[in-house]
A protein has these predicted regions:
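Short amphipathic alpha-helical face segments that pack within enzyme cores
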Residues: 63, 67, 101-104
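Hydrophobic "anchor" residues
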Residues: 46-47
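C-terminal binding/interaction regions
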Residues: 1-30, 75-145
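Compact, glycine-rich, soluble single-domain proteins
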Residues: 51-66
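Short beta-strand scaffold segments in enzyme catalytic cores
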Residues: 30-42
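Gly/Ser-rich catalytic serine loop of serine hydrolases
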Residues: 35-36, 60, 94-96
Length: 145
């Protein structure tokens, strides 16, 4: 039994994000580590973290949520997430969900991700499902084929 066994999964995930949070300027054009995220693998239950990296040119940006998912994929070849938390200097409170690009990424990565829980309020443990953030998603037809 580990010390983390006494913490709920959201506390474990939040603690994991804190290790990644240390905003820094990589160059005069690029910032990193000012948004952090953790995903829990639906396959193994392991927690994977990521941090954002943003440049002056928007096409180079990588959100923390997608970096966490890519870390999961690199480690276990899996893109199905059970849970997601993203934050800055404090735990999520009163909302805060992944951007549209991240929502779309998770929807396209695996049909099962529509059931992914996204923490919107750490204090109350309030969550929302990804499918509720993208009702009537355009890609449903492809998955049903």
């Amino acid at each position: 039994m580990t010390p983390q066994d006494n913490e709920d999964i959201w506390a474990q995930m939040y603690k994991a994000t804190r290790k990644e949070y240390h905003p820094e300027d990589v160059s005069p054009f690029i910032q990193a580590h000012h948004v952090v995220a953790a995903v829990q693998s639906a396959k193994t239950g392991k927690i994977y973290t990521g941090f954002c990296i943003e440049g002056a040119s928007g096409v180079m940006n990588l959100c923390a949520e997608r970096v966490a998912a890519l870390n999961m994929y690199m480690s276990e070849g899996n893109l199905i997430a059970r849970r997601l938390i993203a934050c800055r200097d404090k735990a999520p409170a009163n909302g805060g969900t992944p951007c549209g690009a991240c929502r779309e990424f998770f929807m396209q990565a695996a049909y099962e991700n529509r059931e992914m829980e996204i923490l919107t309020d750490f204090e109350t443990r309030k969550t929302v499902l990804l499918k509720d953030l993208i009702p009537n998603w355009w890609g449903d037809k492809r998955y049903k084929v």
